[in-house]
Amino acid sequence: MRIIAGEWRGRPIQAPSGQGTRPTSDRTRETLFSMLVSRIGSFEGLRVADLYAGSGALGLEALSRGAAHVTFVENDPRALAAIRSNIAALKAADRTEVRPSSAATLSPTQPFDMVFADPPYAQGSGDAVVAAVGQAGWLAAGGWLAIETEAKEPVEPGDWTVDAERRVGRARLTLIRA
């Protein structure tokens, strides 16, 4: 795995060991960021959250492209170690926060401009993300929620709007606008 574009383009990303995570492939990440850039233009100055962060690849990609700050939420110890290792390798500690907790039970915080979520593939996981993000107030008005689910699983946007969906291999990428 590697960073696709921006300040750290081509830099490797360490993936967590074991079967507990399913890292987003370079191809899927490239498709997702292409979809986002065509809509938002730039990540400059954005506050970003990376839920079910795994290796932190989505949040690190956003940082590489100019995001001001990324909060990583993950509860798997091996994934947390990989995230911290990747942050250290990129010398990005001053622009990040790592929250060792479950993304399924988010505590209220200042809203983010962009929220990435890559929950485990399971029936209803995308809908659960929409509900948790909405209840905790994690998405700013006009912000974006990007969710990766299994290809056969559509995501209901709740009070928000689905802006785009795309299938990439076994994955479905859903962009939701607040």
Task: Annotate each PLM feature.
Residues 1-178:
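Class I S-adenosyl-L-methionine-dependent methyltransferase catalytic core
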